[in-house]
């Protein structure tokens, strides 16, 4: 089954999707730039070696062309594969993340609202913060020793981490709302409206 905006692998009967999230395209573009930078560095290294070893200049020249092209090809495939398959679903029952690890393997991680206890949001740098792109972490019950103790800075195997999310703070507040409603007024979870990826005040 292919994951779409409306359905996903393992979706339960009657499970309502409230929001579908992927890494922001800017993050994908940054990763592509990194691939090209690595390819350029390799080209410069091998090309400079052709001058040092004149007897092997032809072979080194070919290597200086082929290896960077291979890096660009494989790197582009990896970035595209990650962008396409890295998708998460926030539903009225849980959060489900599909995390691609290789070209052919994707890990599926889920965390029910019953087991989730705390949401943390942050941006990795000032530029990302200005672009409203950041990370949303949903901590599981196993991460927190007691309700009053501070959540550990490290992630546990049960936590869900969403990277490069647009409007990350708003999404964190939205998940907080789901958690509060689920634990205090569970019958009203069905009335929660889907999250709209627009600035606050422009969603409904």
Residue ranges, per PLM feature:
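Hydrophobic alpha-helical transmembrane segments
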Residues: 49-68
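A membrane-cytosol interface segment of integral membrane proteins
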Residues: 130-204
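Conserved beta-hairpin
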Residues: 71-120
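Short secondary-structure boundary/capping segments
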Residues: 8-10, 80, 87, 127-129, ...
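N-terminal membrane-targeting/pre-transmembrane regions
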Residues: 1-53, 186, 190, 197-204
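Lipid-exposed faces of alpha-helical membrane segments in multi-pass integral membrane proteins
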Residues: 34-42, 63-74
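Short acidic, Gly/Pro-enriched loop/turn segments at secondary-structure junctions
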Residues: 102-107, 122-135
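Soluble periplasmic/extracytoplasmic beta-strand elements of cell-envelope proteins
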Residues: 18-20, 89-91, 96-97, 137-139
């Amino acid at each position: 089954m292919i994951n779409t905006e409306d359905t996903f692998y393992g979706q339960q009967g009657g499970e309502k999707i409230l929001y579908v999230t992927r890494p922001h395209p800017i993050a994908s573009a940054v990763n592509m730039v990194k691939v090209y930078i690595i390819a350029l560095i390799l080209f410069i290294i091998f090309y400079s070696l052709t001058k040092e070893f004149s007897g092997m200049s032809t072979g080194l020249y070919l290597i200086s062309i082929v290896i960077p092209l291979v890096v660009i090809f494989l790197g582009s495939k990896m970035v595209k594969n990650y962008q396409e398959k890295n998708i998460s679903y926030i539903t009225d029952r849980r959060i489900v993340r599909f995390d691609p690890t290789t070209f052919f393997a994707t890990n599926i991680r889920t965390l029910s609202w019953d087991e989730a206890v705390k949401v943390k949001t942050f941006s990795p740098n000032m530029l990302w913060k200005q672009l409203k792109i950041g990370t949303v972490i949903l901590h599981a019950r196993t991460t927190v020793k007691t309700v009053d103790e501070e959540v550990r800075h490290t992630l546990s195997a049960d936590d869900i981490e969403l990277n490069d999310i647009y409007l990350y703070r708003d999404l964190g507040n939205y998940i907080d709302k789901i958690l509060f409603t689920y634990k205090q007024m569970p019958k009203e979870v069905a009335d929660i409206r889907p999250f709209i990826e627009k600035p606050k005040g422009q969603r409904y």
